[in-house]
């Protein structure tokens, strides 16, 4: 369903000009900020309490000024309710006006996003199997990357920070530099971010996940051009797989952000 054969690679991800799903255009039709005339980045998050949703928001927030400079308007849509959205924004720093919620996964399904593993026994056995890498491509290797470090990924903490996970005693971030160096993602650095996120979610589970029927539902990313054509789409297939380039989750935006710098 290509409207054009124009394409170019971004870190091994091929961008094509495609038709935007009607379900997405219908969802944003009444939102003035999402009107045609500007590029729009629409992120379909999973459950508000999903680790992918947390990490995706934490990747987006520091880049909001660059998105604005590039003329790209952002909208995130997650599964949950307003109480969960309020807490999510307070924790991640996501501006509340950029996040909307859906009570179920109907929009995700209409956009052909993966429902995740559907194992006998319901969503909880399915989620546990996905966490073990079953029916969830790339999950185990991504978990491991959080512990081993990644020289192709950016540093997560400044040396002067004191990291509180809510589980361990406060950690001086300078320990990561002494243990692994600086200027890249050090061993255990990303795992510490994930531990902090996990503690926040588990302590407030019912707020973040008011309906656990959709805990395996996966998300997706849609970048729309000013004429509503689709510049980029990514549909994730597994837990901790919200980007095709997890070491730099927003690498697909490089052609537009770098041009605006």
List where the protein language model places each region.
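N-terminal chloroplast transit peptides
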Residues: 1-3, 7
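A short beta-strand-turn-helix
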Residues: 10-40
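Thiol-based oxidoreductase modules, predominantly thioredoxin-like and allied folds used
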Residues: 69-84, 96-104
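Thiol/selenol-based redox catalytic cores and closely related redox-interacting motifs
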Residues: 102-238
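Short acidic, S/G/P-rich loop/turn micro-motifs used as interaction or catalytic elements
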Residues: 48-51, 82, 238-239
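A short, polar/charged loop-to-alpha-helix boundary motif
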Residues: 237-258
């Amino acid at each position: 369903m290509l409207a054009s054969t124009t394409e170019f690679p971004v870190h091994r991800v091929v961008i094509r000009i495609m038709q935007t799903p009607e379900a997405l255009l219908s969802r944003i039709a009444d939102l003035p900020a999402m009107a045609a005339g500007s590029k729009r980045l629409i992120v379909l998050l999973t459950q508000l309490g999903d680790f992918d949703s947390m990490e995706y928001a934490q990747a987006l927030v520091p880049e909001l000024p660059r998105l604005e400079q590039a003329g790209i308007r952002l909208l995130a849509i997650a599964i949950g309710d307003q109480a969960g959205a309020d807490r999510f924004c307070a924790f991640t720093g996501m501006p509340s006006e950029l996040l909307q919620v859906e009570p179920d996964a109907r929009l995700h399904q209409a956009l052909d996003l993966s429902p995740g593993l559907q194992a006998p026994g319901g969503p909880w056995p399915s989620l546990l199997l996905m966490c073990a890498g079953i029916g969830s491509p790339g999950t185990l290797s991504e978990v491991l990357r959080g512990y081993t470090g990644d020289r192709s990924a950016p540093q997560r903490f400044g040396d002067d920070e004191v990291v509180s996970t809510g589980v361990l005693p406060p950690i001086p971030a300078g320990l990561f530099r002494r243990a692994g160096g600086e200027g890249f993602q050090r061993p255990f650095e990303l795992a510490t971010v994930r531990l902090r996120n996990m503690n926040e979610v588990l302590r407030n589970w019912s707020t973040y996940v008011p309906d656990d029927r959709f805990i395996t539902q996966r998300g997706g990313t849609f970048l729309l051009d000013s004429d509503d054509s689709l510049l980029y789409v990514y549909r994730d297939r597994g837990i901790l797989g919200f980007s095709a380039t997890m070491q730099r989750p927003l690498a697909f935006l490089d052609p537009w952000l770098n041009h605006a710098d």
